[in-house]
Curated annotation (Swiss-Prot):
Glycans are attached at residues 38, 242, 306. Induction: Expression is positively regulated by the azaterrilone A cluster-specific transcription factor tazR. Pathway: Secondary metabolite biosynthesis. The keyword Repeat does not apply. PROSITE patterns: FAD_PCMH. The lineage of its organism: Eukaryota, Fungi, Dikarya, Ascomycota, Pezizomycotina. Its EC number is 1.-.-.-. It comes from the Eukaryota. Belongs to the oxygen-dependent FAD-linked oxidoreductase family. InterPro entries: BBE, FAD-bd_PCMH, FAD-bd_PCMH-like_sf, FAD-bd_PCMH_sub2, FAD-linked_Oxidoreductase, Oxid_FAD_bind_N. This is FAD-linked oxidoreductase tazG.
Length: 489
């Protein structure tokens, strides 16, 4: 093999990427792949993005590493030649990356799933997706507070906090992370945990994309709840129920039990030309214990309903009567999806009612707009059980995650959607219970800023760790932590 130091002494710039094979090839394993932008179906060979809105460009081509050593070498060579890179795991991020043009590091080959001999620890590759874990976890009698979308990358979700329907009972996914193997900005491969590189481990758990490339992650596995049988309840209401529906959600602010997770979605039924409100409620326990908690939704006199006990591994496909197709539309790649998000400490029913009226008007005025209002209402009891300073994740007290999700094919609608959703987002911020905009960073679109992503109190430490672990800001494409925060200046 050619001496690696020879490559490190060069500084060829982005133009060096015109010949990725000669630049990177000698330092990659046989299983690694190098792709060029002019290759047939170039983008089809990469992990497909969920949305094409403000997507990155890969003018420098792409590399699909197969080993941790491959990742190290790619980072080192890219650094030495001033080639910007963008790392993709599950491909479900929605931030604005349109200003990025460089090299894609596609982690798709890091998809292993391994359980230890004792059966209480799980180690996965950096690109493993949620659907790869649902069946094994059920077979093992274990569970993790995974998200509700099957195609999301597990590690990517974890590094942003890891919310999901189980987190009221189990806490955040990040709280089950015990160790990561990570390639740092210098190209070093290290382990980070509560005992090794503890400061980096703290930062990775909440702002992880800023500090390295996780090649593998190890989680502890709790026993499954109620022998792996959960209650799934679906309800559909007419638009006339919207006021009562939002009042019910508000009443849950201080009464939502940790075993109950509520997801509300309102969309426009173009076939029948009417708005619809749908609710999926999951109760992690037996049916007889669930029914009293579901009574508020029963009292709203749904047009359709289904309440049943089903195995844990079937939960994702059972939700919402499959109104939105397989995986409820969350796994179809390259849709034009434009999302605005807000984290709420409280539900303010009048704000929801006011916005909903405007949303109905927007639907009617824009017949090709298939947007929806998504409300994820989870107890914060599980997240709050872990001290705030234990991880970089900033918003353990959030009770509701709300998205204004714009689904539409014609990008000519972008300006109208952005204007409408920006005003709507600000309306929710004013009654959110927070002093300013707060968001779950994995839902961020990119314009919210560091305080919204990571919280004012976390940023001084995060910035100090950014200077230590990534002073050249190689990992600053996605929701970047600034090198210096204003309280330090």
């Amino acid at each position: 093999m050619v001496a690696f130091s020879a490559i490190l002494q060069t500084a060829l710039g982005l133009s060096a990427a015109n010949d990725l094979t000669s630049l990177f090839g000698p330092y990659l394993s046989p299983q690694a792949e190098i792709l060029y932008g002019n290759d047939t179906n170039f983008y089809a060979q990469l992990q497909q993005r969920w949305t094409d809105y403000k997507a990155p460009s890969y003018g420098a081509g792409a590399i699909k590493p197969a080993t941790a050593k491959d990742v190290q070498n790619v980072v080192k060579i890219a650094n030495a030649n001033s080639i910007p890179f963008f790392v993709t795991g599950g491909g479900h991020g929605i931030s604005d990356y349109h200003n990025f043009d460089g090299l894609s590091i596609d982690m798709g080959k890091f998809n292993t799933v391994e359980r230890n001999a004792a059966g209480d620890r799980l180690t996965i590759g950096g690109a493993v997706k949620i659907h790869q874990l649902t069946k094994p976890l059920a077979e093992w009698g274990k569970e993790l507070p995974l998200g509700s979308c099957a195609c999301v990358g597990v590690v990517g979700a974890t590094l942003g906090g890891g919310i999901g329907s189980l987190h009221g009972l189990r806490g955040l996914l990040v709280d089950y992370l015990e160790e990561v193997e990570v390639v740092t900005a210098s190209g070093d491969l290290i382990k980070a945990s509560e005992t090794e590189h503890k400061d980096l481990f703290w930062a990775l758990r909440g702002a992880g994309s800023n500090y390295g490339i996780v090649t593998s992650a190890t989680y502890r596995l709790p026993e499954v709840t109620n022998k792996g049988v959960y209650v799934n309840a679906d309800y559909v209401y007419p638009v006339s129920a919207n006021q009562s529906f939002f009042e019910v959600l508000e009443q849950f602010d201080n009464t939502l039990p940790p075993r109950l997770a509520i997801t509300g979605a309102s969309f426009f039924d173009r076939v029948n030309n009417k708005p619809v409100i749908a609710v999926n409620a999951v109760f992690f326990g037996p049916l007889e214990e669930a029914l009293p908690h579901l009574q508020p939704f029963e009292s709203l006199q749904p047009e359709m309903k289904n309440v049943s006990s089903i195995p844990a591994e079937q939960m994702m496909d059972a939700a919402f009567f499959s109104f939105f197709g397989m995986d409820n539309g969350a796994c179809t790649p390259n849709q034009h999806i434009n999302i605005y998000t807000v984290a709420l400490r409280q539900i303010h029913a009048p704000t929801f009612q006011s916005f909903y009226s405007k949303l109905v008007d927007f639907w009617n005025a824009n017949p090709t707009y298939q947007g929806r209002l998504l409300i994820q209402r989870y107890s914060n009891e599980g997240p709050m059980a872990v001290p705030d300073d234990a991880t970089a994740y900033a918003y353990r007290d959030v009770k509701t995650y709300m998205n204004i999700e714009g689904f539409y094919a014609d990008s000519a609608l972008d300006d109208a959607v952005n204007e409408f959703a920006t005003l709507g987002r600000q309306e929710f911020v004013e009654t959110s219970g927070f002093d300013q905009l707060a968001v779950y960073s994995n839902y961020a679109r990119g314009d919210e800023g560091p305080v919204a992503w990571y919280g004012e109190r976390k940023l001084p430490k995060l910035s100090a760790l950014k200077r230590k672990w990534d002073p050249e800001q190689r990992f600053s494409v996605n929701n970047p932590v600034p090198l210096h925060w204003r309280t330090e200046l």
